[in-house]
Amino acid sequence: MLTAVMKDELIKGLLEIFSDNNMEAIILYGSNARNESTAESDIDIAIIMKKDMDDAVRERLIRWSADMDLRYDRVFSIIDIQEKNMQKWGNLLPFYQNVKKEGVVLWKEA
């Protein structure tokens, strides 16, 4: 289960990593979004991006995600999806359909 504390830290951390305004939304999907998670469930997060992230930002994201895994004894599975790909494939590819259908928006750019 994604607790309020985890959610707040997740949003704060991702906003710090993506301070370049490249992030459009943070979406929770999977068993946590469906309220079907167990103690062993990972926390599936999709980050909707305006453009590809550069290698330095990706490295920061990987390190930060690993820290979150250790801090909460949970696996944070974080993927990035370019907004243009979500627009193009959102109604065709099962994975994108799943994120759109069951996803819970945790944060969205104003």
Which residues make up each language-model segment?
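Catalytic core of pol beta-like nucleotidyltransferases
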Residues: 1-25, 33-39, 50-110
